[in-house]
Swiss-Prot record:
This is Basic phospholipase A2 PC14. Pfam families: Phospholip_A2_1 (PF00068). Binds 1 Ca(2+) ion. One of its GO terms (biological process) is phospholipid metabolic process. It comes from Laticauda laticaudata (Blue-ringed sea krait). PLA2 catalyzes the calcium-dependent hydrolysis of the 2-acyl groups in 3-sn-phosphoglycerides. It is found in: Secreted. It comes from the Eukaryota.
Length: 145
């Protein structure tokens, strides 16, 4: 085997090993991003919601810092209710329709409907309230008490 071929094979193996160390984004969260886009007509990038306030993004604690953050807290609570029903909200895929008035759920199973309703309500809530750049990537240990 030629040295160039070995180098190429090594590069492929290293990149595959690196990719396997990155956890995949749960499918529902990717779908939730599309529901948000439908509700707010694409006004804001989805990543704006990944680290906003005390509740938008992983985890959450303290008092929500504004109405948009309160939407995320309510969404977290809705997912907790879904889990109590035996659903897996971060993995549950559902069927929805993006109409002129925003997203609508049309899923068949109880878990799909419940999780879809959680996401649609949160997305509609996000679309109603302003985004405050000062509340993005905040120091949660100081501001979320």
């Amino acid at each position: 085997m030629y040295p160039a071929h070995l180098l190429l094979l090594l590069a492929v193996c290293v990149s595959l090993l690196g990719a396997s160390a990155i956890p995949p984004l749960p499918l529902n969260l990717a779908q939730f991003a599309l529901v948000i886009k439908c509700a707010d007509k694409g006004k804001r990038p989805r990543w704006h919601y990944m680290d906003y306030g005390c509740y938008c993004g992983p985890g959450g604690s303290g008092t929500p810092i504004d109405e948009l953050d309160r939407c995320c807290k309510t969404h977290d609570e809705c997912y907790a209710q879904a889990e109590k029903k035996g659903c897996y909200p971060k993995l549950t895929m559902y069927s929805y329709y993006c109409g002129g008035d925003g997203p609508y759920c049309n899923s068949k199973t109880e878990c799909q409907r419940f999780v879809c309703d959680c996401d649609v309500r949160a997305a509609d809530c996000f679309a109603r309230y302003p985004y405050n750049n000062k509340n993005y990537n905040i120091n949660t240990s100081k501001r979320c008490k």
